[in-house]
A protein has these predicted regions:
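Short glycine-rich substrate-engagement loop in P-loop NTPases that contacts/grips substrate
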Residues: 83-112
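Hydrophobic anchor at the beta1->P-loop junction of P-loop NTPases
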Residues: 53
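Interdomain motor-coupling "hinge/lid" segment immediately C-terminal to the ATP-binding subdomain
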Residues: 2, 9, 149, 157-271, ...
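A short, basic N-terminal segment
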Residues: 1-47, 488-491
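Hydrophobic positions on the alpha1 helix immediately C-terminal to the Walker A/P-loop
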Residues: 64
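Accessory nucleic acid-recognition modules appended to NTPase machines
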Residues: 2-5, 81, 234-404
């Protein structure tokens, strides 16, 4: 006797797909960037690939799938040809994707007929990558969109088989631009195609007027820094509630459930200690050996856990950058949380972070990094940092691709200095490929372009709220362009 009878499976399928019985699923009207990107690929029949939405928990991936179902229905797609599966459901975790599909075809929609598969939390299905490969290769009538919140270490044959078969659409936390939209706030009156790099050609009066356009969103930027880019917390004005949601539904769920179920982690206490250690030292250079000693474990254990946290979309890793042909002798990485609000929630830091210069600097640096990573994603860049051991000069973030090198330094203080002795200028003097460099500041009065004698690179001091907003807006424009002209990177 089978553990699950067909009627047990069918009951779950009907529960997840209300449109089969002429009911509707309640979905919010706000569409994230990932919805627009994935829907373009879903409806383009010339692209024979699946779409994979990848990002942290609670950023709206499930909502995007239900919004896609709603869009399909509005276009006249037969309701029973749309199948949504939440693969972390207790019943569906007992099945392979093939078994769920078999019941769907036997009872709901015939095999061979066109269908749309919306697969949520696909990492919970055994060998999901091989199942998707087979479906994409041998079932051309199926259009597939999947989501995942954690990236398992894949076998070499699995990685090879995935190449060219699905398009990865990143789904990080909300950008500041999206944060304003989801809160239905008025957006600054600025050109939709304005990018940060365009500001190097603008006059000081233009920049002064631009800064004035952003005055009305300063309080929203502070709220964004405090509660982060998660849709549920963005819509709440209760800070304590927001932080509890982040601790319980994002951090604890990943550390105590996903890490056990997906990665087989047994010593959860060690992993939790490491995560708190990273919260306390966010943005600092991490010595694995020192960290292991302080936490009472081995360097190998710490290295393994760091990789898992990165795979679970909880941290960003920045490696040290080479410059001037000099190799980095001590390969020590920097780690940031993927959203500054996670740190606030875990360490119980409330509105006081907005008035503490040291705390606020870490929060701003994390937010700037999130926007840089998302904006440059399509170029598959290397995101690094630079520090010169002899002089202790440093640059917080360097984005590198074959076409550009962009150094970014965060100095969120009242009187940020920028001269030839500053780490940002020293780095630009060593790397002739740099054309533009940014210093992210606090005050509008600092907004402007600076030239330093003897350097070809130009420098832009730009307030953090303006920089992050323009990066988020430009990210939307890039994905719209990608949908028309080229595909994003493939896994």
């Amino acid at each position: 006797m089978r553990l699950l009878q067909p009627e047990d499976i069918l009951r779950v399928l009907y529960g997840f797909n209300p449109w089969w019985t002429n009911r509707t699923a309640a979905v919010p009207p706000f569409h994230r960037l990932a919805f627009d990107a994935s829907s373009r690929y879903l409806f383009d029949e010339s692209i024979r690939r699946g779409v994979l939405l990848a990002g942290p928990r609670r950023v709206g991936k499930t909502t995007v799938l239900y919004q896609l179902a709603e869009r399909l229905l509005s276009r006249g797609v037969p309701p029973r040809s749309i199948l949504y599966l939440s693969l972390d459901h207790p019943v569906l975790k007992l099945l392979t994707i093939d078994r769920s599909l078999a019941e769907y075809h036997d009872q709901v929609h015939p095999k061979g007929a066109p269908a749309f598969l919306l697969l949520d939390e696909v990492q919970y299905s055994d060998e999901w990558d091989l199942h998707l490969k087979f479906l994409i290769d041998h079932r051309p009538e199926l259009r597939i969109v999947a989501t995942k919140s954690a990236a398992l270490r894949q076998r070499r044959d699995s990685i090879d088989s995935g190449v060219g078969r699905w398009i990865t659409v990143p789904m990080p936390t909300l950008s500041f631009y999206e944060f304003l939209q989801i809160r239905c706030r008025s957006l600054p009156d600025v050109p939709r195609d304005l990018r940060p790099q365009d500001l190097f050609q603008k006059s000081r009066p233009y920049l002064a007027n631009l800064a004035q356009s952003f005055q009305g969103i300063l309080s929203e930027f502070q709220r964004y820094l405090l509660v982060g880019g998660f849709p549920e917390t963005a819509l709440s004005d209760e800070t304590d509630y927001c932080q509890r949601i982040l601790r319980e539904d994002v951090v604890e769920r990943v550390l105590k459930r996903d890490m056990v179920a997906l990665f087989g982690v047994r010593k959860i206490n060690e992993l939790e200690k490491l995560f708190i250690y990273l919260c306390l030292n966010s943005g600092g250079v991490l010595s694995v050996k020192t960290c292991a000693s302080e936490l009472g474990t081995t360097a190998a254990t710490i290295s393994g856990y760091l990789e898992l946290l990165e795979n679970a979309h909880l941290v960003y890793r920045l490696s040290p950058s080479e410059v001037g042909g000099k190799k980095v002798l001590r390969q020590q990485n920097k780690y940031y949380l993927t959203d500054a609000a996670l740190r606030n929630a875990v360490l119980l830091r409330g509105e006081e972070v907005l008035t503490d210069p040291d705390e606020l600097g870490k929060v701003i640096e994390t937010s700037v990094l999130r926007h840089l990573v998302a904006y440059h994603y399509l170029d598959i860049p290397k995101v690094a940092y630079w520090r010169e051991a002899r002089t202790n000069k440093e640059v917080d973030v360097i984005v590198k691709s074959p076409r550009y090198v962009i150094p970014v330094e965060v100095k969120y203080r009242k009187t940020p200095t920028l001269d030839a002795a500053d780490g940002l200028a020293v780095y630009c003097a060593k790397d002739p490929r740099v054309r533009y460099a940014y210093m992210v500041t606090r005050e509008d009065r600092d907004f402007g372009v600076t030239d330093i004698e003897g350097l070809q690179a130009r420098f832009l001091k730009i307030p953090a709220h303006i920089f992050t907003y323009l990066l988020g807006q430009a990210e939307h424009a890039l994905w719209e362009q990608a949908g028309r002209k080229r595909e994003p990177s493939v896994s």
